[in-house]
Structures are given as structure tokens and as C-alpha cells.
């Protein structure tokens, strides 16, 4: 997306621990590679624990300034506590991060007038929309709050986030051009990316979206900030 690597923090599985943390096939495990983009430099910095997610967000909230853009991207498992109408993100070692907790952790960014853009691919991710919208986020989720999300057929990606990422890049994983810039103005906004992803999502899921205010999602892109 043209974001400098120094501005990206990766929180994933067991972090830099060399122990096995990913299942390749039945009974076969290995340690996740730290270099995710094959440039020879490690990308994963932290294990996906509550303490580390909170630390990274806290550090960023101190560094970022008014009108900066925070992109919060989740590819993970998720769950729901139906009787409490709560959704959560599954973290490492059976920890979890609930919708209302994430809203609290993101609130300092909005208090500094920082744009927050959250794309959530986990099951039951739609349960985060209400809480995050209430604090002023742009939110796109793979599914409704009481429904699972699904992987792609035939390629190792999750369906919604694959389509969303293709929209942002204007190319898919096979280097085919993607017509996601609807108004041909040289930028794919969060609103346009969601519409493309929802339209091309082939799984049995209903992606959700909201922006507060609506105009932010219509203008916010990785190469454009709302005026």
C-alpha cells in the first residue's frame, strides 16, 4: 500500500518464539516465518497477546499526530458470546480481545483526531461494527456479528480480506487488474474497497461496513486523507 515498513507493526501468533506455531497439514507443524514479504528482514515483532496488542496501540497513539491514518488489520479466528451480544478476536494462548475492549484501546487515537480504519476478517467480526463506529472509526468486516467468515476456495486466503486487499492493490494474487477505483481518480477509498470486496465475495458470508462520519470512508485512502 506504499506504507513505509517502519510504520508497520506486526503482531502474530507466538511472535519471535522459534517453537512450532502453525499447522501445515494434519499432524504437521512448523514455526511461522518472521519475514512475511521475502525481503530478507523479519516483520513479526510481537506475539499476539492482549498485552502486546495494547502496548503496540499505546505506543502508536503517542507517536501519531492529528490527521494521521491508523490502519488496524485482522486476519484471525474470532468468536461470539451471543447472550451478551459480544464478539471477540482470538489471541495467542487462548486469550481474547472483545469488541468493547478494542474500542477503548482505540479511543485515544480519535481523541487526537487520528483517522482509524479497521478491516476485520475473523468470524463474527460484524459484532465490532457498533462499538468501533461509536468512537468514530471506518469499519469493514467479513461477516455479521452472529455469523462465521470463510476461506477462499483453492487459494490460501480468507475470502473477504482477499477481495478487499485485491481492491486496494487494484490487482489480485494472479496479477490481474482489478477495477476497484470506481471514479478513476487515482485512489481506492475505503468505501470503494468495501463495495468491491462485498460484490466479489464468493463465500456464504455478508460483509458489514460503516463509517462515522460517512464522508470519511468516502475520502480515506492509503494515498489520500479527508479534507
Question: For the regions a protein language model found, what residue spans apply to each?
Answer:
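Loop/turn elements at helix/coil->beta-strand transitions in domains of secreted/extracellular proteins
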Residues: 1-8, 66-71, 111-117, 133-138
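N-terminal carbohydrate-binding/catalytic regions of secreted carbohydrate-active enzymes
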Residues: 1-13, 19-28, 53
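Extracytoplasmic/secreted proteins, especially bacterial periplasmic and envelope-associated proteins
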Residues: 3, 48, 52-59, 97, ...
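Solvent-exposed loop/turn segments at secondary-structure junctions
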Residues: 5, 14-18, 76-82, 94-96, ...
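Acidic, glycine-anchored loop motifs typical of Ca2+
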Residues: 22-44, 85-87, 176-190, 212-220, ...
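A short, glycine/acidic-enriched catalytic loop
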Residues: 24-54, 63-65, 75-110
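Active-site-proximal C-terminal subdomain of hydrolase catalytic domains
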Residues: 116-212
Amino acid at each position: 500500500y506504499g506504507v513505509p515498513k517502519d510504520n508497520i507493526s506486526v503482531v502474530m501468533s507466538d511472535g519471535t518464539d522459534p517453537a512450532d506455531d502453525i499447522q501445515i497439514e494434519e499432524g504437521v507443524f512448523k514455526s511461522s516465518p518472521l519475514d512475511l514479504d521475502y525481503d530478507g528482514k523479519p516483520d513479526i515483532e510481537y506475539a499476539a497477546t492482549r498485552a502486546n496488542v495494547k502496548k503496540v496501540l499505546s505506543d502508536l497513539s503517542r507517536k501519531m499526530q492529528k490527521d494521521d491514518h491508523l490502519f488496524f488489520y485482522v486476519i484471525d479466528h474470532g468468536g461470539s458470546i451471543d447472550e451478551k451480544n459480544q464478539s471477540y478476536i482470538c489471541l495467542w494462548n487462548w486469550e481474547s480481545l472483545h469488541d468493547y475492549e478494542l474500542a477503548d484501546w482505540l479511543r485515544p487515537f480519535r481523541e487526537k483526531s487520528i483517522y482509524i480504519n479497521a478491516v476485520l476478517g475473523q468470524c463474527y467480526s460484524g459484532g465490532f461494527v457498533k462499538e468501533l463506529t461509536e468512537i468514530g472509526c471506518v469499519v469493514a468486516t467479513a461477516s455479521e456479528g452472529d455469523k462465521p467468515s470463510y476461506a477462499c476456495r483453492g487459494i490460501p486466503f480468507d475470502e473477504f480480506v482477499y477481495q478487499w486487499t485485491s481492491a486496494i492493490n487494484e490487482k489480485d494474487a494472479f496479477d490481474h487488474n482489478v477495477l476497484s477505483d470506481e471514479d478513476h481518480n487515482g485512489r481506492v477509498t475505503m468505501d470503494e474497497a468495501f463495495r468491491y470486496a462485498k460484490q466479489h465475495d464468493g463465500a456464504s458470508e455478508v460483509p458489514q461496513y460503516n463509517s462515522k462520519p460517512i464522508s470519511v470512508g468516502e475520502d480515506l485512502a492509503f494515498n489520500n486523507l479527508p479534507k
